[in-house]
Amino acid sequence: MTLLAAFLAAVPLAPPAQGASAQPPSPQASVRPTEPKTVAECLRAAQTYAGRRMQELRAAGQTFNWAKLSEEATDLAKQYAARFAIATVATADLTPLARLYVLAKQPGLAEQAIAKHLATPGISDAEKADALVAAVDISMGSPVSDEAVKQAEAYATRLDAVKDAGRQQIQAHSHLGGYYRGVDVDDKIFEHGNKVIALGRGLTPDDKRATATMLAGAYTNVAEVYGGWEQADKAIGILEQGVKDLESAPQAKRQIEPTLERYRLVGTVAAPIEAPRWLNAPAGTMKIDPKGTVTLVEFTAHWCTWCRRTYPSIVRLHNTWAPKGLQVIFATELYGFLGQQRALTPGQEIEGDKKYFLEEHALPFKIAIEGRRVATGPDGSTPPSTGNGDHYKVGGIPQIVVIDRQGRIRLIIVGSDPASEARLNKLVERLLAEPTT
C-alpha cells in the first residue's frame, strides 16, 4: 500500500497494466503547455505530470514505463522546488512548498516548511488546518517509523481542535486509518474509521462528494474489522448506513457496494473451488466442493507480501486441525510474471508456483491455480473475474473464508491481522465440534 498516495496525488493515478514498457521522451517534450510560476502551479504540474504523460503516450499508441515516468516527475519537482526558498516565500505558500518538497523526495525541507508555517503567529484556522494535515502526511511518508506514527497522531489531535476543518480532519484520519489498515491493527482502524464517519455526517453534500473516496474507505474499513470479529451483521449494517449517509455521492456508493456484497455472503452456501490446475491435489482434480467438511479457503498470490505473512499461521492451523477434519485450500491464479521474471508462459509460471508455494513456503494443502485474466479494455484494464474470486467477492487479498460442514460461509477476513490466528483456531474448533447433520 502506498501510504503517501493520498497526500501526493491531487488527481489519483494508477500504475499501468503489467508489462507496459518504453523509454518516454524528456519531461520537456510536450507536457508543459504553460510554464508554472507560483508554488501552487508548480505543485500541481509536478503532481499531474506522470498521469498526463501516460495519457499522451497512450493517445499516441506508444507504450511507457511507469517507474520512469515517476522518476521524471520527481526530477521535475526538484527543478520546481529549487526556484523557491523557505525563508522568502509567502506564509501561505509554505504548506504547498512542503508538498512540493515531498514530491521531490526532500522530506527534511518539507518538515522545515511545515514547522515554520505552524510557528507563524496569527495564521488563520484554514491555514493551520492545511499545515497540520500536511504534517500528518509528511510524518507518514515512507519509510514509516513508530515515532513518526506517534507524531502523526499528535498532529491529528491538534487538527481535531481546529474549528471548521472537517475536510482536513477527514483527510488526516483517513491517512492514519489507511496506514493501520495496511498493517492490520484493528483497534486503530476502528478508531480512525469511526472518526471519519462521524466527521462526514457533518459535511455538506458538496463536501461529501469531494471526500467521497475517503468516507467510503472509512465505512469499508470499519466493516472489515467487524467482519473479522465474526460480526457480519454489524459489517452489513455499517455499510448500509454508509450507502444512506453518502447518497449525495454516487461514487461512494459504488465503492461500498462490493464490500457489502462480500459480507452478505456470510450464512450463504459456499461455491465450489474450481481450477484447471492444482498443486498438492490428486491428478485430474478440477473442483472441490467444501460441503461436508469444515474448510478454510485463502485467496492469495505469489506477489502478495501480506498474504505471505499469513502462511505460517495457516500452516499451524492446518497441522493442528487437519487430523480432526479441517480442509485448507489456497486459491490463486496466473499473472504472467513471478518475482523479476516477466512474460512467463503458463507452464513456466506453474513451475515457479511449485517452487514458491511448495518448496519455499512448504505449504502442505491443496492450491487451486486459475488461468490468467488478459487485459481487454482500451485502457489496459482486465475484465471482472468470473471465477473463484468473483464467487467469493474478493476485492483485496489475503481474503480468508471459513465454511462449515453444511457448506455455509461462517467468516470472511480481509487482511493479515496477527490476532486472527487465535480467532480462527477458536472458530475451527467450534465448527468441528458441531453436529454433522
Locations of the language-model features?
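N-proximal helix/coil linker or "cap" segments that precede and/or mark the start of modular domains
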Residues: 228-276, 288-291
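Structural register within alpha-helical repeat arrays
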Residues: 45, 96-97, 135, 169, ...
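N-terminal leader/linker segments that initiate helical-solenoid repeat arrays
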Residues: 17-92
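Thiol/disulfide oxidoreductase modules built on the thioredoxin-like
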Residues: 289, 361-363, 369-427
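Flexible helix-coil transition and linker loops at the boundaries of alpha-helical arrays
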Residues: 32-33, 76-90, 118-128, 157-167, ...
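Short active-site neighborhood of thiol/selenol oxidoreductases, capturing the structured segment around
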Residues: 284-310, 314, 328
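Structural microenvironment flanking redox-active thiols in thiol-disulfide oxidoreductases
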Residues: 309-363, 368-385
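Helix-turn-helix repeat elements of alpha-solenoid scaffolds
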Residues: 62-78, 102-115, 141-154, 185-201
